[in-house]
Each structure stands twice: as C-alpha cells, then as structure tokens.
Amino acid sequence: MFTVQALVSRSFATVIVAAWLTQPASAAEVPCLILPYVEVSVVSPTEGLIETVAVERGDVVKKGQVLVMLEASREKAQQAVARAKAEQEAAIKTSRVKQAFAARKVARATDLLKTSSIAQHELDEAETEKALAETSLLEATENKRLAELDLQRANAELALRTVKSPINGVVVDRLQHPGELAKRDPPILKLAQIDPLRVEIFAPLSMLNQITVGQQAEVRPSDQPGGVYAAKVTIVNRVVDSASGTFGVRLEIPNHDLKLPGGLQCTVKFNGAKK
C-alpha cells in the first residue's frame, strides 16, 4: 500500500517564484526546481509484526522487488490447510463410483421389470439411489470448488504479508524496522522515482504562449553535479496565478544512470518552437 505525492509543495513554489523575481527582465533563463518524478510512502496493507526489511536508505529498487516481509506463520498454516482440502479427490471419486453403480442398478432393474422379475417399487428404489448418488457427486464437486476458492483467499492473505516496490526508484528513508508493528503512520519506507526527473517552474505570464507541450529545453542545475541536461515540456498549466503573475510548467529529464539527484535548484532555457 502506498501514497503518492506528485505535486510541488507550496514552499517549493515560493522558492521558485522568489528566484524568478530576482532575475533581470531580459534574463533568458527561468529558475526551476528538479524533483523526483514521484515520491511514494510505502505502508503495509495489513497490520502485523515486521519480520524483515530488505533495503536500506540509498538502495536502488526495481518495481515488484520485495521490500518488507511481515511475520506470516498463521497465514502459511492456513494456506497449507486450504491447499490440502483443495487437492482432495477422494470424495469426488467415491461419489462417481456410487453414481456409476446406481446407474447400472437402474439399468438392470429396468430390464428385470420388463420380464416381471421384480416389482415396480424395486425399480423406484434403484432410481432413487441413482438420484441420491448424482446429488452426492454434485455436492462433492461444489465442496471442491469452495475449497479451491478458500485456497485463493489464503494465498491472497499470505500475499498481503509481503510488501513490494510499486516503482523503479531509490530508497529515500527507512522509518520502521524488524520487530516493530507495521502500521500506516509512519510509513515503513519512502521511495522516490528519479528516472525520469521532473522539473517544475513558474514562468512569467509573458511566456504563456511561448511554451508548448513537447518543446525542448536545457536545464542547468545550480549545484553539483552541474552540467546541462536535455528536457522536454510535459505540462503547461493554463491557469495563471494572479498573485505572482506566473503559470506552472513541468518538464521531464531522462536520468537513466541515476546520477542527477532530485531536490536541486536549477535554471531552464527553452529551445524555441515545439519539435
């Protein structure tokens, strides 16, 4: 279970707007902030004692990777019982034998009745036994189906004791440890997806019709590791913030080698028309 924070916080927006206001009017570059694409708080979908936490802060994780395992002895035992019941065939086999025997008995009784070798009530009894055998087989089949569904439920409950990563990313923080009771607050781990990174800016109103989705840009981090990074506009907010006279723009930077961290201040220069 996870919660995703995908919007720039008000404090970040304040930093960006303040930086823009200090730029000269002729400045070609707009202040920006490099952030993780998404940030995820990993919580357990069910309460339980934490048995293992497989990652540490700073570790790179893959989507679907096991992060946390809760103590699950009861769930494993329930799964074993459910599997044993679901795999039982004896009741169905017995019912099939009884049904086949009853069918043969009815056939014999029918032939004997034609020659008046038995009374009608004996045929009736044979047909009743056949009907009961068919009902018994149906009941055994339904019970097996219920056992299979119970096994599915047991498997699902056991699966809830394993928490997997919802994203490709890095571990930002580890807040709970083995021996503690897993609960929603605090989360067990915090993850961040940093490939791609998102770049948030608040551009001046004069640029509203100059920036388009798909447009290319160059992003320069203000701090280490420095350099220039190619980015592409993915969102242009069409609602203007009247207080600051700005509008929001989001870009994405590929970060396959994960060398560029999130949280850096930067400047962005747009490369003209949409490509």
Regions found by a protein language model. Name each.
Residues M1-A13:
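Bacterial N-terminal signal peptides that target proteins for export
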Residues I16-L49, A230, T234-I235, G262, ...:
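N-terminal beta-strand block that forms a small beta-sandwich/beta-barrel module immediately after a flexible targeting
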Residues A25-E29, K164-P166, P221-A230:
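Short coil-to-beta-strand transition motifs
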Residues A28-P45, L149-P166, L191, T234-V240:
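Short beta-strand-turn/beta-hairpin segments enriched in glycine/proline and small hydrophobics
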Residues L33, E51-A54, V60-V66, E157, ...:
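Surface-exposed patches in structured soluble domains
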Residues K62-I167, L175-P178:
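Amphipathic alpha-helical coiled-coil/rod segments that serve as protein-protein coupling scaffolds
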Residues D173, G227-K275:
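Structural microfeature recognizing short secondary-structure transition sites
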Residues I194, V213-A230, L258:
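Low-complexity, intrinsically disordered
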